[in-house]
């Protein structure tokens, strides 16, 4: 495995899914370390929807899964994706791609000097190429901050499905999107932290992917048993202490209820101040966190 900020060596990756309500592990999928995180993502969502008859409203993951292809496939499943933000790579001292504004009506980019980068072609990898005129770039006062010594004109690439990525990015910046992403660190991040610190998943105890898969599955089973016991214990305690809260959720106390795709928002009074969970027509439906 060769990744920035990660140790180099032979590793396995545990692609885990938890529900956003109780932090129950719903899927464990182990791959070699040279497999990109985004490769099995949508496949694991579909597998769980078919196997457990899940009807999630949204999925959330870190920036490693924030690709145009995944956003398109998640959208086609009728889901909303809330992913971490990944900045486009740029050279030190040079303008990043965020400095160039895309105008969808004209299908052009506008540079900081208000010059157009027009569409030229689409390459075999599915990226549209936008180029500025060489004559304009050669006379630009900010040429040193924009081009390298080998470039004669500015060129940008945009994936053909980039619009889906922009759509999910807009939702992630909304109040609903922020609440979902905030919940992510309390679920999937906590689940992995417990696995490493309390259950020995920081290291492989056996060789081979089959043995590692067995270790990951057993670890997930133990964590789920502990979580289920804790949830049932809280439910029994809650029933004893309050007879007036039977209609409320036994897993999370919420400050508000919200749903996606144009559903109306409704507010609930609650002094506890826990984050929101997805609601549809008054019934809780899950959203998934994959890592």
Task: Describe each region flagged by the PLM.
Residues 1-291:
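Anion-binding and metal-coordination hotspots
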